[in-house]
Amino acid sequence: MGVMAYPFLFCLLLVHFGLGAIGASREAPSRPDPPRERTLRAKQHAQQPARASASDPSAPWSRSTDGTILAQKLAEEVPMDVASYLYTGDSHKLKRANCSSRYELAGLPGKSPALASSHPSLHGALDTLTHATNFLNMMLQSNKSREQNLQDDLEWYQALVRSLLEGEPSISRAAITFSTESLSAPAPQVFLQATREESRILLQDLSSSAHHLANATLETEWFHGLRRKWRTHLHRRGSNQGPRGLGHSWRRRDGLSGDKSHVKWSPPYLECENGSYKPGWLVTLSAAFYGLQPNLVPEFRGVMKVDINLQKVDIDQCSSDGWFSGTHKCHLNNSECMPIKGLGFVLGAYQCICKAGFYHPRDFSFNNFQRRGPDHHFVESAKDVSEEVHVCLPCSEGCPYCADDSPCFVQEDKYLRLAIISFQALCMLLDFLSMLVVYRFRKAKSIRASGLILLETILFGSLLLYFPVVILYFEPSTFRCILLRWVRLLGFATVYGTVTLKLHRVLKVFLSRTAQRIPYMTGGRVMRMLAVILLVVFWFLVGWTSSVCQNLERHISLIGQGRTSDHLIFSMCLVERWDYMTAAAEFLFLLWGVYLCYAVRTVPSAFHEPRYMAVAVHNELIISAIFHTIRFVLASRLQSDWMLMLYFAHTHLTVTVTIGLLLIPKFSHSSNNPRDDIATEAYEDELDMGRSGSYLNSSINSAWSEHSLDPEDIRDELKKLYAQLEIYKRKKMITNNPHLQKKRCSKKGLGRSIMRRITEIPETVSRQCSKEDKDGGEHGSAKGSSAGRKNPQETAGGSGKPKEESLRSRVFSLKKSHSTYEHVREQPGGPGSPPAQSREEEEATDNSVLGSPVGANRPRPLQEDSQAVSTESVPLVCKSASAHNLSSEKKPGPTRTSVLQKSLSVIASAKEKTLGLAGKTQAACVEERAKAQKALPRERETNRKYSNSDNAETQDSAPPNSSHSEEPRKPQKLGIMKQQRANPTTANSDLSPGATHMKDNFDIGEVCPWEIYDLAPGPGPLESKVQKHVSIAASEMERNPTFSLKEKSHPKPKAADLCQQSNPKSVDKAEVCPWESQGQSLFEEEKYLMSKTQVPLGRAQGENSGQHCATGVCAGQCEELPPKAVASKVENENLNQLGEQEKKTSSSERNVPDSHNSSNNFQPPLMSRAEVCPWEFETPDKPNAERSVAFPASSALSANKIAGPRNEEVRLARKV
């Protein structure tokens, strides 16, 4: 055939690869195995349960039983040199052993050798043998003539054997046997063999020596074993169809074929050559091929075998199949067997790797079982098999990997953590108790000033901010890490959101530059804004929690492990990018709070709460910045104890400090210093109660002082403010009093003129003080005379104020302006019952601040309280900026008659100029009166023009829903206004002791000079109205003394209210006006001068107004100092005419109720007015009338303003 036959045969084998794959068959029932094979199989089946139990990791300290059996067999049955060669692979030791036949490793532990086919290095040889066998089956079964001419086809068989070695390098030898008689012939007829010798292949024809195959030995087992059980390897598709079906299958080229399962594997063996073992372990693979009988029955024809060199095949003792499978010495419960690749056919090529949580005590580099070196003898290792057992010891608790038994996890300080959690629980309990205490003292002024709901909200948010420390006390888990973010963000948004919104409310109310009243921010509105903030935070937390749950489904955990510098491990909640975003959001929110703190830094407030909130916001900003920096930078290296202490320190440096700043000042505030209470109004309580109107002036003042606006802008703003306040008051009065007629537009001019004159008070006072040097002598005598007249009044009233204090309180005895909306604050009370506590406090404060003479007759405790909170001890804090810069405006505005309100700022702005000049002003007033005598005749005509408008103004300014007890007050006001027009001197008698809160230290001509212009003599019926009012008021005082005291505690709108003391049935005149008893001589002197001599009206008024204060009707209003001449004249005439004056006074007192009892209001009086009040017919000088422009109209306006809030009190008096 030649050389070309070998490649051709090899190609045929490759083409037949697919046919061999198709010929899969079921294995037929086998014949009984020979005794040797049965013994080997029995041993293998007996060892399988042992291996199964050894591989069970649940058995405690379980170890491979096959490893122990293998060691024992190698020590007992295997020759020493062979066992050493098997462990080391050293061929020098193998050459020293003598042999007579080959040595097989039969009966060794491990599963069936047939399963060794799974080894990757044997797949090539196995496939080549299977393809060659199937090729012979096809050739012999398809052509019967091939069996008859063996010698002719001998070259084809040689080419087939040679192709096996050339096709697979791992095959070292291949052979084929052929026999025409299946069982009758004891030996095969043809025996061909090919051997690989280094780089060449040797072909041999051993047919002549094939007779030795007839003997069944270990060396011929590959042939006899297949010959005996050839039927078990047969498989023919369609054999159940009979001969016809079988022939049909052959026509379709579907015949008998073999597969890999039909290949017979021999145990590994060593060949014996020349009395010694040849180095290299071999294994024999053999397969039979078949022909067909004439009846198409398969018949055995021969065997093909290949010998494979195993020196490059690794032994896997860790696997579950193959040679020496499961013979490792690793303990399966604490270690893992890992084979070592590339070492060849040697034992011990594996490592025992300790499992997680275990370590090897004698191995410091890595935890494994090292294979013994080539210089070590097997016997030495066999002797200490028990000592070589690989044992892994457990690590410390929680350690996944370790090299020794030292702890790898951070050991927590239990006592430290217990102390922290105990203190945290105490703080949370105190926080909860603080909520109860705040609710318990919810009616306290300090709590109402801040708002109960807002304080409770801050405390609840602080309780949430205390929870992170409690969460970090426990072992981290996914739920705890999620809950940690929830309580932190919700608590932060609740606490500092509320604080920031409170600051925002202060900024909105106090720093508004508009004159229009903005809608105040109540506690409910702040809570609604806070709800929006919490809703945003809640929505973010829901989204973040959803993303965390989705990451858990992707096996992305929220729990991680950190490692300290000492390589100790601890569990922690991982820091995500969302944590950086939340920290940035907190920082930006606090920056907004810092801006608000800066904006409201100058705003006055009750208990300085914005100042403490600003400290809390700045503290949170700084501490949180440090906390987040440490947390983000050192989070992976801070163990659980340090992280717990970090959160603990951050919580108490921010939350606890915030609570302390908000609560401690409220409960530790002392009420002994009322100066701060008066100077800094409790604005937040007013805002929450919806009564912010009285503090609008303060907000505008603060805004102007903050931004330093131009004076023109201030004037424009104030004009808008007063105009809108007037419109609102008019609308409210018309709404509540539909019976009142609307005012005419022609009356608006007078109101605007009066307002502009009011604003000129500071300049008037400053001009009066400029004449101090000129009138020095007169000032000293006037001051002494005024002090002499005031002492009896102070003695009768029980007042102990020094003379300096009374002089200082003259100018500033005006009552603080009442807001249009403060009538709501009046609380009703039944007849005869004491008023409410809040009403008493308000009355006490008003009377003490005003310093009226009526306050001198009050009980001692109320008087002391009044002195404590008097405005004499209050710093100059302007409650509004109503007229600070309007005084410089010289341009007269359009006239307008409207009921305006006076504010305390009118006097507060002038106090800086006049506080030290109170005594000096008196001398200037005396000089001005002398000059006013010349101007009166010329201005009487001017005063008559405004008489009608003043009448209408007085009627409209009366309280709308007055009861029966207030009906006398309307004609009283109307009559008094007409008296002012009838006689200029009547202006001094138009102020009651209640009205002295505004002008007890000022002369009418000095403060309100336009009132002098408006005064003109009126008809007689006007006097009857005054007398009627006096008699009714006196009867009311007689029937209800409580009502009389109540009337004294508030400013009366007109001076005629005290004329009721002239009634014989009323209280004695000395009790109401004690100074009258000591000043009768002065009164008699004036009366005598009127009746005996015809004194000009202007000069008489100048003298009387300088000599004494008005008695009965005008008590306490004129405390001006007279000139020296008038004073000396008074002293001389007091001694001579005292008796006659007392008689005339009593007669005049009896005539007053007679005129009151008149049925017609326009009936002429029974006595002339000169007999009752002779000093009113004295005419002041013209210069005095010109200079005194400010006060009577303003006092009338103040009376009109104050009359509104007293409807309820007058209604009660009517019931009495």
From Swiss-Prot:
Disulfide bonds join 99-272, 481-573. Residues 1-23 form the signal peptide. Residues 85-281 are annotated as: Cache-like region. A motif (VCPWE motif 2) lies at residues 1072-1076. It is found in: Cell membrane; Postsynaptic cell membrane; Presynaptic cell membrane; Nucleus. Keywords: Cell membrane, Cell projection, Disulfide bond, G-protein coupled receptor, Glycoprotein, Isopeptide bond, Membrane, Nucleus, Phosphoprotein, Postsynaptic cell membrane, Receptor, Repeat, Signal, Synapse, Transducer, Transmembrane, Transmembrane helix, Ubl conjugation. Belongs to the G-protein coupled receptor 3 family. The Cache-like region shares similarity with the Cache domain, a well-known receptor for amino acids. It acts as a ligand-binding module that recognizes and binds glycine and taurine. This is Metabotropic glycine receptor. It comes from Bos taurus.
